[in-house]
Amino acid sequence: MKVRNSLKSLRARHRDNRLVRRKGRLYVINKVQRRFKARQG
């Protein structure tokens, strides 16, 4: 999992990316291409 400053640009890289908030942190998850996992904060 990558830690990034801006998740909005990462989310646009694949159409199956989802932006999720868990425990005060923002995550990008992707069930199809798991290599797009990232978090912020």
From Swiss-Prot:
Keywords attached to this entry: Ribonucleoprotein, Ribosomal protein
Its GO biological process annotations read: translation
Cross-referenced InterPro entries: Ribosomal_bL36 (IPR000473), Ribosomal_bL36_sp (IPR035977), Ribosomal_L36_bact (IPR047621)
Q: Name one GO cellular component term.
A: ribosome
Quote one Gene Ontology molecular function term.
structural constituent of ribosome
NCBIfam families (alphabetical): PRK00831.1, rpmJ_bact
| PANTHER family named among the record's database cross-references | 50S RIBOSOMAL PROTEIN L36 2, LARGE RIBOSOMAL SUBUNIT PROTEIN BL36B
What family classification does the UniProt entry report for this protein? Belongs to the bacterial ribosomal protein bL36 family.
Q: What is this protein called?
A: Large ribosomal subunit protein bL36
Q: Which organism is it from?
A: Rhodopseudomonas palustris (strain HaA2)
